[in-house]
Curated annotation (Swiss-Prot):
The lineage of its organism: Eukaryota, Fungi, Dikarya, Ascomycota, Saccharomycotina. The active site is at H215. This is Malate dehydrogenase, cytoplasmic. NAD(+) binds at G20, A21, A22, G23, G24, I25, G26, D57, N119, I144, S145, N146, M266. Its main location: cytoplasm. It catalyses: (S)-malate + NAD(+) = oxaloacetate + NADH + H(+). Its EC number is 1.1.1.37. Targeted for proteasomal degradation when cells are shifted to glucose-containing growth medium. It comes from the Eukaryota. Substrate binds at R106, R112, N146, R185.
Amino acid sequence: MPHSVTPSIEQDSLKIAILGAAGGIGQSLSLLLKAQLQYQLKESNRSVTHIHLALYDVNQEAINGVTADLSHIDTPISVSSHSPAGGIENCLHNASIVVIPAGVPRKPGMTRDDLFNVNAGIISQLGDSIAECCDLSKVFVLVISNPVNSLVPVMVSNILKNHPQSRNSGIERRIMGVTKLDIVRASTFLREINIESGLTPRVNSMPDVPVIGGHSGETIIPLFSQSNFLSRLNEDQLKYLIHRVQYGGDEVVKAKNGKGSATLSMAHAGYKCVVQFVSLLLGNIEQIHGTYYVPLKDANNFPIAPGADQLLPLVDGADYFAIPLTITTKGVSYVDYDIVNRMNDMERNQMLPICVSQLKKNIDKGLEFVASRSASS
């Protein structure tokens, strides 16, 4: 097949595994990566000759078609197709980055939490495969599947509890929930309302808006007070913006009449994250500064990195939180807890308590799932 890869090529490549690559997010994300990652390759980097995309999906016919289609694109990024028929092992072997958009999509009336039981089972199985096939001391795992608030705890807890080889690997520093779409939406919506209201002229730049907390409803805290985009929004406009960011996913589901969810914008957000990790692992940059949903404690129940010990009391001991991080090739190296100290009164006294209360329930749901799965196995 034209989209298979020889072992000798794989040895010299940076391998990215996309699990769920034939789905709505997976196809678009794979297209962006195939088309754009060539620009990360630099002539000065001789240790990696090229980038390889290993595309996996349970739908063999669909993933073979997607991979064949992508393989015709004129970039030096290689692609290979994988399904249960050939085994997920070939997809994950030697992968440096594993991206997971796998799972069932949202339908009308469904919240991210409604998806939990089905997607938690999928994430657990994929986590088992990652633990068995990947180098846990090096691999980065980016979880896109929803509900992120619960599924990242499922992934981390399942690997640490059920795979003894993970205990000293530091893998918990390299499993991250992708919440970038909330940041993308906050930036887009803020620029839009400022222009429509005549508060700012139309410019070809986008505002930076930090978004912390979780990735569902009121666990999402857009910090418009810390945006670099000067604004004179009134209270009603601000409330509208916050609600729109928190429930932007519902807006897309309704617009598609329940026949789809936010796939294109999520693929764009996912690409923006993956390209940073590719740049890091190629040596183009020394560290990443970005917001991800991560555990705040390591496998031994100590703070995951400097800054986590200061953040934990600020979020009432929540074990997972989306927060700006510094990330090196070893994983999370610093947690920017001070962003919470810089919140205004409304964000700190109204939004944060609601976020933390709901987030703890979401986290417990994930941990309970793993505990019950372990007990029944």
